[in-house]
A protein has these predicted regions:
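Conserved small/polar residues in nucleotide/adenosyl-binding loops
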Residues: 268-275
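Hydrophobic (often cysteine-bearing) scaffold residues that line and stabilize catalytic clefts
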Residues: 2-6, 102-105, 135, 248
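Short acidic (Asp/Glu) and glycine-rich catalytic loops that position anionic groups and cofactors
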Residues: 86-90, 117-119, 211-214, 229-235, ...
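Conserved, charged catalytic cores of large soluble enzymes
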Residues: 100-155, 175, 179-181, 255-262
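Active-site-adjacent structural elements in folded domains
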Residues: 216-219, 266-267
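Class II aminoacyl-tRNA synthetase-like tRNA-binding/catalytic domains
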Residues: 1-97, 147-214, 221, 237-240
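Internal glycine-rich alpha/beta core junctions
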Residues: 177, 191, 224-235, 239-263
Length: 278
């Protein structure tokens, strides 16, 4: 599948589950002084999560253009270190505004990945927040994932917060092993090794982080998911680098023609912040 087909497939999948398509919002947020750039698909829905406005619909799907170069969600130091982080990327997402919650989010994500796109189940891993027994049980009851591939992780990896303040909650991530040897997979590699790519983050927004650091319950529980189009395109197109997909190659080919030089993928040898524990 090319990138346009993947984007269209994602949107149609959720439209068929009664989601309303919402266009990508500007990369410079409107009326949100807490953000320099739009860094996630949920930014435009923040007033809904905070109960400041009423939602026009209870379910939404879109593909959001994002920039991450500063703040809490900053990928700048990862760019060039690996082949799957970018300052600009496209986030596929589906949302529930006080409608469905964890059960549907998990079930539909697995359905899309394994039935529609037919990703190899033997390469997929799921993580949940360490205290989220509900999400853990749903993964093992609703899907046919190997229970040993459902991992409990801490706040750093599985409690999502948009910024220092604002909507937040536990999350469940789906990771994909891109290595050559399936037998070399280990649970200890998830969230650590670059052989395991985070493809989709299912966020269960139920709290609001206040300036003093405390949490208050939101008036309703919501679902906010984000999946990287570039990474999914890499997997579905049988590549090992985002730069070798149809999203980047036309640009690279044009640069080659102008520069009169051939493209070679060379990564920095310095350790990434992930490897150095930062």
């Amino acid at each position: 599948m090319n990138s346009k087909e993947i984007r269209k497939s994602f949107i149609h999948f959720f439209e068929n589950k009664n989601h309303n398509f919402v266009r990508s919002s500007p990369v410079v947020p409107i009326d949100d002084p807490t953000l320099l750039f739009t860094n996630a698909g949920m930014n435009q829905f923040k007033p809904i999560f905070l109960d400041q406005v009423n939602a026009n619909h209870t379910r939404a799907v879109n593909s959001q253009k994002c920039i991450r170069v500063s703040g809490k969600h900053n990928d700048l130091e990862e760019v060039g270190v690996d082949t799957f982080h970018h300052t600009f990327f496209e986030m596929l997402g589906n949302w529930s505004f006080g409608d469905y919650y964890k059960r549907e989010a998990i079930e539909w994500a697995w359905e899309l990945f394994t039935k529609e796109w037919k990703l190899d189940k033997q390469r997929l891993w799921a993580t949940v927040y360490e205290d989220d027994d509900e999400a853990f049980d749903l993964w093992t009851e609703l899907t046919d994932i190997d229970p040993s591939r459902v991992l409990r992780c801490g706040k750093k990896d599985n409690f999502w917060e948009m910024g220092e303040t604002g909507p937040c909650g536990p999350c469940s991530e789906i990771h994909y092993f891109i290595g050559d040897d399936l037998d070399k997979q280990e649970s200890s590699g998830v969230n650590v090794s670059d052989q395991y790519w985070e493809l989709w983050n299912l966020v269960f927004i139920q709290s609001n982080r206040l300036p003093d650091g405390s949490l208050e319950d939101l008036p309703a529980k919501h679902v906010d998911t984000g999946a990287g189009l570039e990474r999914i395109a890499t997997i579905l197109q049988g590549k090992t680098s985002n730069y070798d997909t149809d999203l980047f190659l036309p640009i690279i080919d044009k640069i080659q023609n102008i520069a009169g030089s051939s493209y070679t993928c060379l990564l920095y040898t310095s350790p990434s912040p992930r490897d150095s524990g930062q």
